[in-house]
Amino acid sequence: MAKSARSKSIRRNKKVLRENVFQPVIDERTKRLSAHLRDQVNDLTKSSSSKEEGIADNSLKEVSSSEVSDNVGMEVDQPKVSTSGPRDNNRNKWAKKHLKKGKRAKNSNFSKFLKKK
């Protein structure tokens, strides 16, 4: 079990990598994201307390209305795809292509499901 993923040496090495290499990267990313969110919250609180409160509210209304209009535009009635029944696989596609050309006739089980003309 020397090269197995369950071997003690492999597990120990992965644990060291997680602790010493990957975890600091995750911690730095978390700090960056929290700082970014903190800045956004501070900006929102400053703008709401300033004279531009009406402008901020109008911009929020515009954004929310544009999101609603985008969502309405996204709701397109598309025909539903049936998830039941046989699927085409590469073998069937190949058989259809080559049987149509008449180059090769295969007598196999899956060819009986092909539509015959």
UniProtKB/Swiss-Prot annotation:
**Nucleus keyword on record:** yes
Tell me where it mainly resides: nucleus
Q: Which GO terms describe its biological process?
A: assembly of large subunit precursor of preribosome
**Keywords in alphabetical order:** Nucleus
Tree of life domain: Eukaryota
| Gene Ontology CC terms | nucleolus; preribosome
Positions of the UniProt region annotated as Disordered: 39-117
**Localization per Swiss-Prot or TrEMBL:** Nucleus, Nucleolus
Asked if the record carries the keyword Transit peptide, the reply is no
- Give a single Pfam family match: YBL028C_N
| Family annotation (InterPro entries) | DUF2423
The Basic residues compositionally biased stretches are 93-106
Bias class Low complexity marks the residues at 107-117
Q: Which PANTHER family match?
A: UPF0642 PROTEIN YBL028C
Q: Which family does it belong to?
A: Belongs to the UPF0642 family.
Protein name per UniProt:
UPF0642 protein C32H8.05
Origin organism is Schizosaccharomyces pombe (strain 972 / ATCC 24843) (Fission yeast)
